Design a protein with these regions (language model features):
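FNR/FR-type flavoprotein reductase catalytic core
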Residues: 1-78, 148-293
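Ferredoxin-reductase
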Residues: 77-167, 183, 210-213, 217-220, ...
Length: 293
């Protein structure tokens, strides 16, 4: 039964039929279910034979899996990347976007611009991933932007206060600043944040990116986070900055954009936009798969 329960969890995970917050609770049972199945398998070893291929796989492979399950049960996953900190400033960027600055007691290690980290605010035990919009030179001051899109983000907007404790785990992610080459960067909504991180890093290093265009998509100028800052950063980094506002120019024609684009595209934003771009692009498309199941 343990095997079938574990298999059911895998199917539910792949199909994403359960809301993430509920799935997260169920997912915590996976190590327990795995250990139950492995112990049951060990009870059958005398019949199977320890030195048979199945027996050795169960003993060695299953044992390694059991070690991982125990490691997870004791909360050791990501512990070396965990940092303590406090909320130092809260700055509303618009009606739905809150910029949060966090000061850590010890620096992040291995950070690359564009990566994200998990933030657990006010000891709620609910770590959520947010892009690191900016990281100070000593990697002790982190900036993130939170858009009020769900229950957790609405709670942060309403209840988070300066001085609240934060646990930060990370950084993670492969959507890091690429090597210099002509490219199109497209950020939609709050998906603009990794590009802010890239540009902040370029300006800090004194680097430029000629031949690169940044396209920011937003409903209105008021709902376009960091657009003024981006214009200045792009000017200093030699990047062509374009702001597409739906209120003025209508919805961006992603199909046409994809068909005429011949340089690599780096995209961060809503999944439907990514799928449309991917369907019409002949050039490579790079994006962070910001899903965890």
């Amino acid at each position: 039964w343990g095997f079938y329960l574990l298999l059911a969890l895998v199917v539910v995970s792949l199909l994403a039929v359960v809301h993430y917050e509920r799935f997260k609770v169920v997912h915590r049972l996976a190590p327990v279910i795995y250990l139950m199945g492995w112990v049951h398998g060990l009870c059958l070893l005398p019949r199977i034979g320890v030195l048979t291929p199945v027996g050795l796989t169960l003993l060695v492979g299953g044992g390694l899996g059991a070690m991982g399950a125990i490691y997870s049960l004791f909360g050791r996953v990501g512990q070396n990347a965990r940092r303590q900190g406090t909320v130092s400033t809260l700055t509303p960027l618009d009606e739905r976007t809150l910029e949060i600055r966090v000061t850590l007691t010890s620096p992040l290690s291995g950070y690359r611009p564009g990566q994200f980290a998990f933030f657990d605010f006010a000891g709620r035990g609910e770590p959520h991933p947010y892009t690191l919009v900016n990281v100070s030179a000593d990697c002790r001051t982190l900036t993130l932007a939170v858009r009020a899109l769900g229950d957790h983000t609405h709670w942060l907007h309403q209840h988070l206060r300066v001085g609240d404790a934060v646990i930060v785990t990370g950084p993670y992610g492969a959507f890091a600043l690429p090597d210099p080459a002509p490219a199109l960067w497209v950020g939609a909504g709050i998906g603009i944040t990794p590009f802010v991180a890239w540009l902040e890093a370029l300006v800090r290093r004194g680097e430029t990116r000629p031949g690169t265009t940044l396209l920011q998509c937003a409903p209105t100028a008021e709902a376009a986070p960091y657009h003024s800052r981006l214009a200045e950063l792009c000017r200093r980094a030699g990047v062509d900055y374009r702001l597409h506002l739906e209120s003025e120019r209508g919805r961006l024609d992603l199909a046409a954009l994809g068909e005429r684009q011949h340089t690599p595209v780096w995209f961060c934003g809503p999944e439907p936009m990514a799928h449309t771009l991917d369907a019409h692009l002949t050039a490579p498309l790079h994006r962070e798969l910001f899903r965890f199941r």
